[in-house]
């Protein structure tokens, strides 16, 4: 039996989807029982969150009880902050479980997890030196920034010491964490791409040809590091409608930017907010191209992978792990709307590019392949 551990973020994002898909994979493809022990940052409150960070976790005995009650042999830990911390992992080990630590982001070193602040990529925090995050107030709240800086400096080594093995989503993520002096046991750090359930289904419908009804699609949390403003400017230059699915702190500013371009032929921008899976599938089926204009060093690029799995050509920034997934023709410099516009004009409606992308993402994220690799990692953890 595998017990998943995850502290949900205030704003739901790709990591929550990956956790859900991995739980599905364990149950349906590996054939093991799986349960999720979950807490939510939204429910904690600032005082209790700070307590969890500074103490290295709240109520670790809840985790120990769950391990014993369910007979879990492996604890698969995802986001631990602010409520679980290293004490949850130690409690699981004491109760008899082996620990697999899954680092979806850079949160072991970076207080915001994405190595991005004040409009640019940032790698100032290294190892236990997390003071730059406090000085720059990366969390947007001095008390919160102080709590994260102290917690990372105090407890990051304790977290790692509890892990029998560590999973990261890409080669780039592993090397970035190494460059950040993350105190990881590198011989036990393994790369595992997330599974995409959609790749188990029928092939995606044929890509609609580019034409007056064409639109580009961005599926993203609306935050500065995601570069949605670049997509707005690029689609305005390319004369193609842009649909934006997602929400976040930058929505108001992005809507204002889009209003400035109204009246330009073909430059309509529509903000759809969060959409459910069924609506997202419909949007992808009718789009001509998907854009992933990130400014930050993505640890994987889930939005790109899901669009490729849906049969869309993808244009993405040449940052982070995106070049491991997206072919060279679909990569552009981050923050360059004219380069992005040019790629949109070349690739919108390109069925050959879509077919190549589908083949690439199948090689990386097919559920059967990911299941085999994950089952082997669980066996390694059990044998330590």
Give the predicted meaning of each segment.
Residues 281, 299, 304-309, 323-324:
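Short alpha-helical segment that forms part of, or immediately flanks, the ligand-binding pocket
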Residues 274-275, 282-287:
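Short alpha-helical donor nucleotide-sugar binding micro-motif in glycosyltransferases
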Residues 349-379:
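A charged, aromatic-enriched C-terminal amphipathic alpha-helix characteristic of glycosyltransferases
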Residues 329-338, 344-350:
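Conserved acidic donor-binding segment of nucleotide-sugar-dependent glycosyltransferases
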Residues 127-202:
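Donor nucleotide-sugar binding/catalytic pocket of nucleotide-sugar-dependent glycosyltransferases
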Residues 285-299, 312:
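Acidic donor-binding loop of glycosyltransferase active sites
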Residues 255-278:
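Nucleotide-activated donor-binding/catalytic signature segment of Leloir-type glycosyltransferases, i.e.
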Residues 16-17, 214-237, 249-253, 338:
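A conserved mid-protein helix/loop that constitutes part of the nucleotide-sugar donor-binding site
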């Amino acid at each position: 039996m595998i017990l998943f551990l995850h502290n949900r973020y205030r704003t739901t994002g790709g990591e929550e989807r990956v956790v859900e898909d991995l739980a599905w994979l364990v149950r349906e493809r590996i054939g093991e029982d799986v349960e999720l022990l979950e807490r939510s940052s939204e429910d904690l409150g600032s005082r209790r969150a700070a307590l969890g960070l500074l103490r290295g976790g709240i109520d670790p005995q809840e985790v120990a009880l769950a391990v014993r009650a369910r007979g879990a042999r492996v604890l698969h830990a995802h986001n631990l902050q602010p409520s679980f911390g290293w004490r949850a992992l130690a409690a699981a080990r004491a109760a008899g479980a082996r620990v697999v630590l899954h680092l979806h982001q850079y949160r072991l070193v970076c207080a915001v997890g994405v190595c991005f602040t004040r409009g640019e990529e940032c790698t100032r925090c290294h190892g236990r030196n997390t003071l730059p995050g406090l000085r720059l107030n990366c969390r947007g709240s001095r008390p919160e920034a102080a709590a994260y800086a102290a917690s990372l400096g105090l407890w990051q080594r304790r977290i790692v010491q509890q892990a029998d093995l560590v999973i990261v989503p890409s080669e780039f993520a592993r090397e970035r964490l190494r460059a950040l002096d993350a105190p990881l046991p590198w011989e036990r750090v393994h790369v595992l791409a997330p599974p995409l359930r959609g790749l188990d289904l029928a092939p995606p419908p044929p890509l609609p040809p580019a034409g007056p009804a064409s639109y580009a699609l961005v599926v993203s949390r609306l935050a500065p590091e995601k570069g949605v403003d670049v997509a707005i400017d690029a689609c305005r230059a390319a004369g193609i409608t842009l649909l934006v699915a997602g929400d976040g702190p930058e929505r108001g500013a992005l809507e204002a930017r889009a209003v400035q371009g109204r009246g330009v032929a073909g430059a309509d921008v529509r903000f759809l907010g969060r959409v459910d899976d069924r609506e997202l599938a419909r949007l992808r089926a009718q789009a001509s191209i998907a854009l992933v204009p990130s400014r930050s060093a993505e640890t994987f690029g889930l939005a790109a992978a899901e669009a490729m799995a849906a049969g869309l050509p993808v244009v993405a920034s040449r940052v982070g792990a995106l070049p491991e997934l997206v072919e060279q023709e679909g990569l552009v410099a981050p923050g360059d709307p004219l380069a992005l516009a040019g790629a949109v004009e070349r690739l919108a409606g390109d069925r050959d590019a879509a077919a190549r992308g589908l083949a690439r993402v199948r090689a990386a994220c097919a559920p059967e392949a990911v299941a085999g690799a994950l089952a082997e990692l669980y066996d390694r953890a059990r044998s330590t």
